[in-house]
Regions:
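Cytosolic, long alpha-helical scaffolding segments
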Residues: 1-143
Length: 143
């Protein structure tokens, strides 16, 4: 019988898979809300948050690829730093977008619909940061 040897703990693999699933859940949730709430306009902040999620996911891919053999730890930490920076940018975009909604949107229902979509997108960026945290934990345990 052959055993599958993992490069790191099963708990870390589970944490990584769960965090990745959370990103997908929030991205799906934002699209689902747009559909269910019949939102026909994608606002600039929504586009910006989607772009930031995409950047975060690209860095997640880079980081996870480097975790396979743990030879290029610096590349993983660089990805994690970029993901953390992306999440901070997303917080700013979200805060400004919500402030703009409260300032300019006179229809309370439209305000709520847009805020819900923005919130789901922003939470996806938070989950990207969670993945970065798991990758950093794996590095610390295996360095």
């Amino acid at each position: 019988s052959k055993n599958f040897i993992t490069p790191f703990d099963r708990e870390d693999i589970h944490a990584l898979a769960s965090a990745l699933d959370d990103i997908a859940d929030y991205v799906h949730g934002s699209a689902n809300r747009m559909y269910l709430y019949n939102l026909t306009t994608v606002t600039e902040p929504m586009k910006k948050l989607a772009d930031l999620i995409h950047l975060g996911c690209k860095d997640i891919h880079k980081g996870i690829s480097e975790l396979r053999d743990l030879k290029n730890i610096r590349n993983v930490t660089d990805s994690c730093v970029r993901i953390n920076s992306m999440e901070n940018q997303a917080d700013y975009v979200f805060d400004m977008a919500v402030a703009d909604l409260f300032k300019n949107e006179t229809n309370a229902i439209e305000l709520f619909k847009n805020k819900e979509v923005l919130n789901a997108l922003e939470r996806a960026t938070d989950k990207c940061e969670d993945v970065a945290n798991v990758m950093e934990t794996i590095i610390v345990k295996n360095a």
